[in-house]
Amino acid sequence: RICTNCCAGYKGCNYYSANGAFICEGESDPKNPNVCPRNCDTNIAYSKCLR
């Protein structure tokens, strides 16, 4: 299980729950990261990134 949230997740990465349900795409640019709360979205189990 990873610890992240949609705000802090990287653009181009999709985040999924443990049962494979799509939750969100990340909103943070790795070169210019968002200021995000550091909480873990407990629904997010894994990510798949396109690059």
Curated annotation (Swiss-Prot):
Superkingdom per UniProt: Eukaryota
InterPro entries associated with the record: Prot_inh_I20, Protease_inhibitor_I20
One Gene Ontology cellular component annotation held by this UniProt entry: extracellular region
Site description Reactive bond for trypsin, residues in chain: R38, N39
UniProt cross-references to Gene3D superfamilies, sorted A to Z: 3.30.60.30
Key words of the record: Disulfide bond, Protease inhibitor, Secreted, Serine protease inhibitor
Entry-linked SUPFAM superfamilies: Plant proteinase inhibitors
Location of this chain's protein in the cell: Secreted
Gene Ontology molecular function: serine-type endopeptidase inhibitor activity
Disulfide bridge partners, by residue number: C3-C40, C6-C24, C7-C36, C13-C49
A Pfam family matched in the record: Prot_inhib_II
Family from the record: Belongs to the protease inhibitor I20 (potato type II proteinase inhibitor) family.
Protein name: Proteinase inhibitor PTI
Organism the protein comes from: Solanum tuberosum
